[in-house]
C-alpha cells in the first residue's frame, strides 16, 4: 500500500500491479499505471536506502542524469514533478522513472564494445565539466580503512578469522 500511496501522492494513478525488481542497495519496483498516464503503462520506482545518501547527493545525481539525457545519451532520467525528481512519502525517499526496455551488450562483439566505450567516454566528458559537491568520494580511507576498522572494532568477524583478516587487510590497504 505504501508504494501505491506514494505514487498517488505525486499524482500518478497505479492500478495495483506491482513487481519487485533486482537492486543491490535500494528497493526498486515496477508499477503498472492507469491507461491515461503520460508516462506509459509502467513506471519504475526507486526507494532510497535510509541514511545512505543525502538528499543533496541524490538530487545532484538526478541533475547529472537529466543533463546526460538532454545530450541524448542512452539512459533513463527520473521523472520531474513539481520541479523535483526526489519525493518523500511517510519518511521514504523515492524517485520515479519511465520503464525502458533494453538488453546487455555483447562484449565479445567489437562494435557493441566500441559503442559502450564511446558512451562511457561521453559520460565521463560531461561529468568532468564540474565538481560533484555532495557525492561521497571514493577513497581508500573511507571505503578501505574505515570499513576495516569498523569490522574489527565491532567484532563482526568470526574469532578464528580476525587475525588473518586484520593482517591481510592491513597489507592490502598500505
Locate predicted features:
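Short, conserved active-site entrance elements at the starts or edges of catalytic domains
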Residues: 161-174
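A cross-family kinase active-site recognition segment
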Residues: 106-164
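ATP-binding pocket architecture of kinase catalytic cores
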Residues: 32-132
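ATP-binding glycine-rich phosphate-binding loop
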Residues: 10-32
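Short, P/G- and charge-enriched loop/turn segments at secondary-structure junctions
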Residues: 16-17, 84, 173-174
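Conserved beta-strand edge residues that scaffold enzyme active sites
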Residues: 21, 82-83, 134-137
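Short, non-transmembrane alpha-helical segments in secretory-pathway proteins
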Residues: 1-13
